[in-house]
């Protein structure tokens, strides 16, 4: 009997240790202090991290998207967030963009690194920037589809690899682990309980497109 109880304790301990308590803490900060709605993402396939744990064998964002629950379940409720990450302690943190939460503009990592270096030299103020091994995302104020359409229409050229994460979209937040690798803050939010400051989408798109043009990032790199 003691042997059975000891074995059960070891199994329970192993399950708890397999989780990452910093994910729960980060999810609670985002949801309750910043009031940004989050939900757990589908994790990468444990048999191969480049593959997704969802049923789609050709998933293009492995381990970096919502699946069950769906995106509409995103919430700022502390009890729900705690329940999710207690039961799925290694799940990526997915931010539902738009509405009362920030939106995002993302671009390939190499191009983003060059663009941010130029914007730094210009002393442009940026909000938080999320980095994965393949793409970086600049958080911006919420925008409407109409606003985005007018902004892009006014441009002579917009790199095709720019992605816009608005209402109904999502991004993975640090310290998530996805199929492409670790998600981290390239520009972390300033410490404090208030929601992080984010710039207008117009300022970011104008600056990023101009920076990419001036740094000579070619279409294949984008």
Language-model region placement:
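Conserved phosphate/metal-binding and DNA-contacting active-site motifs used
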Residues: 1-135, 139-222
């Amino acid at each position: 009997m003691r042997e059975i109880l000891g074995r059960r304790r070891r199994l329970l301990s192993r399950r708890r240790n397999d989780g990452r308590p910093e994910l729960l803490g980060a999810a609670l900060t985002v949801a309750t202090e910043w009031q940004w709605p989050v939900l757990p993402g589908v994790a990468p396939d444990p048999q191969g991290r480049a593959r997704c744990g969802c049923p789609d064998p050709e998933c293009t964002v492995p381990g970096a998207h919502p699946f069950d629950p769906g995106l509409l379940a995103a919430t700022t409720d502390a009890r729900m967030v705690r329940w999710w990450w207690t039961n799925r302690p290694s799940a990526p943190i997915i931010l539902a963009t738009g509405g009362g939460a920030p939106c995002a503009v993302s671009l390939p990592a190499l191009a983003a690194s060059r663009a941010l270096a130029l914007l730094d030299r210009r002393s442009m103020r940026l909000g938080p920037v999320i980095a994965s091994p393949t793409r970086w995302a600049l958080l911006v104020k919420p925008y409407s589809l109409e606003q985005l359409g007018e902004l892009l229409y006014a441009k002579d050229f917009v790199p095709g690899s720019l992605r816009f994460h608005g209402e109904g979209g999502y991004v993975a937040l640090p310290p998530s682990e996805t199929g492409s690798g670790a998600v981290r803050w390239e520009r972390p939010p300033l410490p404090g309980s208030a929601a992080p400051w984010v710039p207008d989408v117009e300022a970011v798109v104008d600056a990023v497109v101009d920076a990419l043009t001036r740094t000579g990032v070619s279409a294949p790199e984008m």
